[in-house]
Amino acid sequence: MSSITAKLVKDLRDKTGAGMMDCKKALAETSGDISKAVEWLRQKGIASAEKKSGRVAAEGAIGSYIHTGSRVGVLIELNCETDFVARGELFQGLLRDVSMQVAACPNVEYVAVDDIPKDIVDKEKNIEMGRDDLAGKPEQIKTKIVEGRIGKRLKELALIEQPFIRDSSITVEQLVKQVAGQIGENVKVRRFTRYTLGEGIEVEESDFAAEVASMSS
């Protein structure tokens, strides 16, 4: 098996535009054969997805999903570069998949970690810094532990960081990149809204014992 060097990874990345981790995995899967690694990335729909990510995606579609029982609903905007692609089967399939993903993730509030407001990040940091299990630890160690916990917590809030519900071996971000590679355009999840039936409505709690008593009187 060939040694996978940093230069080999860089060469593959330059050829395909794929991410560093994807290039490393491709080379590992193909025993360091760069030609086969390019084919592997193309089969996965990853090759050139990174290069496309800088292009303007102003077209697309707004999708909706209503979960069984009509208790959860989702609206989502998915962007691409051309109206032709937006009407295509691959793009529409991705739109459905990501809509279902949002419905299945009640704790997700943002598209990406970078979208999370600074005040939310600071609030999470303050909560973690005040944990009892960190009391007495050196400041440097405490900071490192908190950074790890915060990173994990912020990923829980970001849609593209979630394991894909139909294939937990990839994230939503990787799924989007795969489809972008397959259709040859930049694809982005722009925004979404998740609705839960009765959310935010205060329901008056009834006195069950009193109800039973009144029925028997």
Swiss-Prot record:
InterPro entries (alphabetical): EF-Ts_dimer_sf, Transl_elong_EFTs/EF1B, Transl_elong_EFTs/EF1B_dimer, Transl_elong_Ts_CS, UBA-like_sf
Keyword Cytoplasm: yes
Region (Involved in Mg(2+) ion dislocation from EF-Tu): 82-85
Chief location bin: cytoplasm
Compartment(s) where it occurs, according to its Swiss-Prot or TrEMBL record: Cytoplasm
Keywords (A to Z) from UniProt: Cytoplasm, Elongation factor, Protein biosynthesis
A cellular component term, taken from the record's GO annotations: cytoplasm
Disulfide bond sites: none
Membrane-spanning parts: none
SUPFAM superfamilies, alphabetized: Elongation factor Ts (EF-Ts), dimerisation domain (SSF54713), UBA-like (SSF46934)
Pfam families reported in the protein's UniProt record: EF_TS (PF00889)
Domain of life of the organism encoding this protein: Bacteria
GO MF term set: translation elongation factor activity
Purpose of the protein: Associates with the EF-Tu.GDP complex and induces the exchange of GDP to GTP. It remains bound to the aminoacyl-tRNA.EF-Tu.GTP complex up to the GTP hydrolysis stage on the ribosome.
NCBIfam families: tsf
Membership in a protein family: Belongs to the EF-Ts family.
Protein's recorded name: Elongation factor Ts
Gene name of the record: tsf
